[in-house]
Amino acid sequence: MNTDKVWFITGSNSGFGRSLTEAVLKKGYKVVATTRHPEEIEDLVKEYPDKVKAVSLDITEASEITSAIDTALQTFGRVDVLINNAGFGTLGAVEEISDEQVRKQFEVNCFGTLNLTKAMLPHFRQRKAGHILNVSSVGGFTAFPGTGIYCATKFAIEGYSEALAKEIAPLEIKLTLVEPGAFRTEFAGDSLATPDEQINDYEETAHKFVKMQEEMSGEQPGDPDKAAQAMIKVVESDNPPMRLVLGEDALKATRQKIETFQKELDEWEDVTLSTSYEDAKTTSLG
């Protein structure tokens, strides 16, 4: 096994990021561990002084992105794997969430991830190598009541990632979307954002789902350490998937969405096909 790869991991101080950083270091890889709170990973720096470089990074700041990548290249000479993990959740009915909260959610989860990816691509293109893992969510494939704004950011990540994967494939650069279900991270804990005011009409939909997530915090079925091993397996694979669904709950929700969508496609096929010009030639969007 080649353990010479250099991993660049965002949000490495907690949740998936912390688990993955620890697992990657234990396997002998080198890591550029980025976080807004580098003091929280000092223990890893002491344990692996030659393998890990802790870097302060707020992915919403362009200058910090540039500086972090420069530091990575100066320290280890290259980056082989980019893990876009940093992010947080905003839960509540779509109508309840303020414009400020919506914009902050997109700034971090979507634009921050996108800008870091774009900044890393010149290095990957130059080397004709690299693997990007965008940590999305099962909520990037199917949405639930109370998750509309959070899921909107993840749907956005999925959209640009699908297109980007096709653009960079000829350049020998890989991209994988990671879609976890409920895992024991800080998602439903201190990092969770909620509306300042609630609307009673959403009590049985959005509020019910959000309350369920909050009550589940600390008891989610997913193990972040096992998720880390799954992500390492993907990076070490010669033929990694475009999407990696993690967790039984995520797999079930994904299959339900596919089944429902397929049923609607079949039921409305006649209407779908009724909108073309009679003399139109058959085309493909793929």
Residue ranges: model-predicted function:
Residues S137:
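Residue(s) in the substrate-gating loop at a strand-loop-helix junction
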Residues N13-S14, H37:
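Conserved glycine-rich cofactor-binding loop
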Residues D50, T71-N84, T90:
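A glycine-rich helix->loop->beta "capping" turn
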Residues L57-S67, D99-E100:
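The beta1-alpha1 cofactor-binding region of Rossmann-like NAD(H)/NADP(H)-dependent oxidoreductases
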Residues P170-P241:
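SDR active-site lid
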Residues T117, T153:
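Active-site helix of classical SDR
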Residues A93-V94, Q101-R103:
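Substrate-binding pocket helix/loop in short-chain dehydrogenase/reductase
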